[in-house]
Amino acid sequence: MNEQIKNYFENLRINSENDATKLSRGTLEAYWTYEFNLNHNSSEFECNELPWTTDMSDFVKTMREAGVETIAVTETSTALLENLHKLAAQGCSIEGLCTIIRPDIWGNAKESPAIRIRLN
């Protein structure tokens, strides 16, 4: 994760610190994805949970504004296929399958299967 992305999300946090209702649900989901990556040190910008389909537009818009070019989706919910279609409807494209690496709770490298999405 580069400094542009960190600065964007940190500014988002600071600007909404006293009133999270200023942010849309999709923007909050994007911020929580950023937080997940800070806490898990994934090898790629990992998205372990996509937003509700109704919030996908704001989620993608926020990620693009932050400078995120690709996400590695590790979500395994039953809504995954529908979410992939919603991402495609936002102009995103599936680059293919990938494997992300992040430390487990003991600090050992753990591989997780993912789908790499280009946010275009």
Give, region by region, the residue ranges found by the protein language model.
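N-terminal leader/targeting segments
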Residues: 1-82
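Functionally constrained cores in energy, signaling, and assembly domains
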Residues: 34, 88, 113
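A generic structural signal for short, non-catalytic loop/turn and secondary-structure boundary residues
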Residues: 66, 87, 108-110
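C-terminal edge-of-domain segments
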Residues: 91-120
